[in-house]
Amino acid sequence: MTATDDTRTLVVAERLVAPLPTPWVGRVLAAGAVIIALRLWWSTSALGPRLVRDLVIFVALPGLLAVRYGGDIGWRVDRTAVRNAALLAAFVAPFYVVGSTLPTVRAYYPAWRTTLALGEFLPHAVGLVLVAFAAETYYRGLLCVGLRELGPGCVLVSPVVYALMHTGKPPVELLLAGPTDVLFGAVDYNSGSILPSTVAHGAGLVLLDYLVLRDPVIPPDRVLASLRWLPVPL
């Protein structure tokens, strides 16, 4: 066998071995399955109990896994993450504004009772941001940034589960859940941080509840007429 043949054999061997995932990937996928099972089993209604549940299963469990095995779940803040957070939040804000005018959305939100009184809405808003942080830690942190070694395709790991978790919400929200998951995952993947999706999601939830508690900023008839092509009730 010549030196050239040896080199070719080595290159082929490297190509066969390189794509094999590390044990961390298996741990992430196993933990992800256990966590979503706990999420389905542990039902809550009020915001307080919801926060306890989500912070335990969506934040504490992935956090313990990352600490135990030295994995990365996107808990990082740097200049790139801050820039992308601002850009993503600015991009999705109009969708929340338009969505706040839809009858099905206004009938569902706020998901937890609140008013615009500062003493009531402020703690409500903090709760929403924490809910968003918990969700992003699991869906985009554990199941996207945590699977970065799989390449860009890791953004496709969680959309189906994320969409299923929106069952029972307004149909238009369920329709957009999958694409939103992919968008948020792609930005977080390229940022190496869940800050962009956390800011966009948290700010969006607060903005949506604020707008729903007020008169529509855009005439609903105009919005309904422009979106009548969508295949879901609005």
Labelled PLM ranges:
Residues 134-157, 186-193:
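Membrane-interface helix/loop boundary segments of multi-pass membrane proteins
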Residues 29, 82-86, 121-125, 153-160, ...:
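Hydrophobic alpha-helical transmembrane segments
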Residues 38-40, 44, 173-231:
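Functionally important transmembrane alpha-helices
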Residues 46-50, 70-134, 145, 149, ...:
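Juxtamembrane helix-loop-helix connectors linking adjacent transmembrane helices
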Residues 18-70:
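Alpha-helical transmembrane segments in multi-pass membrane proteins
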Residues 32-41, 92-100, 159-167, 203-212:
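Aromatic-anchored segments of alpha-helical transmembrane domains
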Residues 43-49, 164-172:
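Membrane-interface helix caps and helix-loop-helix hairpins in membrane proteins
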